[in-house]
Amino acid sequence: DMGNAYGIDIGTSNFKMCCSDKDKILNEKNIIAIANKTELLAFGDEAYEMYEKAPEHIEVSFPVKFGVIADIENMQTLLFNFFNKINEGKKITGSDFYIAVPTDVTEVEKRAFYELVVDSKVKAKNVYVVDKPVADAIGAGLDVTKSKGIMIVNIGAETTEISVLSLGGIVISKAVKIGGNKLDDCIISNVR
């Protein structure tokens, strides 16, 4: 089967994937359930149902922490399983992958996103790394090529990235380790 293009956004809490020839977007919890240390039990939303409820022999974990990949092996398993899910089990190889990565992370952390896809079982033809703020702006229908500055604020589960774009590039981008989870906690503690 001829390869398509896939866009991926790997977040701390959610994994999003879209495909150039389908108009659906896969958006599931970025979480995995492993039984007896080796056996894949569930992934995505199904694994999230088990989070904090599983017996001891089942490990349910999020492989991304603070916006960067903390557990490569489990993240590769998730990537492959989400890829199969969006393709409804059809064998597809030789596709192009565009992966949105945070800007305010180290080169090593950025490279980990690239290598994750390159080394995985999705058998990519090409892997392109796209700065998340630029992807966000384009996705929001903004013209990033203009000289007028655009400010993008991306609030994730554990990080918030604030960026200013101009002339197709990033002028400045800063990430802080506060996101939706922290906001939820603050609301909960104030409501009690």
Regions found by a protein language model. Give the residues of each.
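Short glycine-rich anion-binding loops that position phosphate/pyrophosphate groups of nucleotides
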Residues: 158
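A structural feature that tracks compact, well-ordered secondary-structure segments
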Residues: 161-163
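Nucleotide/phosphate-binding catalytic cleft detector across ATP-hydrolyzing
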Residues: 1-155, 165-192
